[in-house]
UniProtKB/Swiss-Prot annotation:
It is an enzyme of class 2 (transferase). This is Putative pyruvate, phosphate dikinase regulatory protein. It catalyses: N(tele)-phospho-L-histidyl/L-threonyl-[pyruvate, phosphate dikinase] + ADP = N(tele)-phospho-L-histidyl/O-phospho-L-threonyl-[pyruvate, phosphate dikinase] + AMP + H(+); N(tele)-phospho-L-histidyl/O-phospho-L-threonyl-[pyruvate, phosphate dikinase] + phosphate + H(+) = N(tele)-phospho-L-histidyl/L-threonyl-[pyruvate, phosphate dikinase] + diphosphate. InterPro entries: Kinase-pyrophosphorylase, PPDK_reg. Bifunctional serine/threonine kinase and phosphorylase involved in the regulation of the pyruvate, phosphate dikinase (PPDK) by catalyzing its phosphorylation/dephosphorylation. GO terms for molecular function: ADP binding; ATP binding; phosphotransferase activity, phosphate group as acceptor; protein serine/threonine kinase activity. The lineage of its organism: Bacteria, Bacillati, Bacillota, Clostridia, Peptostreptococcales. Belongs to the pyruvate, phosphate/water dikinase regulatory protein family. PDRP subfamily. It comes from Alkaliphilus metalliredigens (strain QYMF). PANTHER family: PYRUVATE, PHOSPHATE DIKINASE REGULATORY PROTEIN 1, CHLOROPLASTIC (PTHR31756:SF3).
Amino acid sequence: MNNENLVIYILSDSIGETAEQVAKAAISQFDTEDYEIRRFPFITEKHHIDEMLQEAKKENSVIVFTMVVEELRNYIMEEAEKMQIRSIDIMSPVLHAMGGALTTTPKREPGLIRRLDEKYFRKVEAIEFAVKYDDGKDSRGLAKADIVLVGISRTSKTPLSMYLAHRNMKVANVPLVPEVTPPKELYEVPSQKIIGLTTNPIKLIEIRQERLKALGLKNEASYASMERILEELEYAEGIMKRIGCPVIDVSTKAVEESAGIILEIFRDRGYNMPNGR
């Protein structure tokens, strides 16, 4: 056995990154460069553990491991002790402490953190998508969207896009304005992916008047007039009928409620939701 060079064996039933980072943090506290780290990820069988231990036995070694599967964790501890190999269980003390605080038991499934990371990045991607393709900014996004929302101004298109993005849905939205022809890409999107948003004209007048007030403008602007609102609603209704998409009245609904209806529509159609729900 070489007493000078330390070999740190990293064993994990996942990728082993946690154990390696802890080992590196610990070894940095010592004034030495005479060490080597060997990482062995995805250890799921006892015979793999046996192979690592036989190698470690020949050297001045320490085993640092993260095993959430209790059977494998116990096996490493027992076999390492028999062979007089130093071993450190990184995960179990943390699981034990958290289990006591939460009064529940851990799942003990390898790789869960990777799944959480993947879900997080899907959400970030969906949020970035919603921002990029909000308010008809770039019609090229319509073909890539999971959901396309259409409606006149102040029908909750943007809040709904962001809410659904937090459910990992890529959402684009297109404003419908009588003076502006909808992009041709809108008619190329399958109608099953499009949701129309409408509202009560009285409610919309109130919302738009509040909007004008916030901007320091007078309520007399045509934007908040009944005549203009009815014109917009009629125009939007014609577009939605042409598309053949379902229409949701958002006038009395919170964003969460409207989003729930949209997701239910897609589930009923058999769409595989990105967040698996």
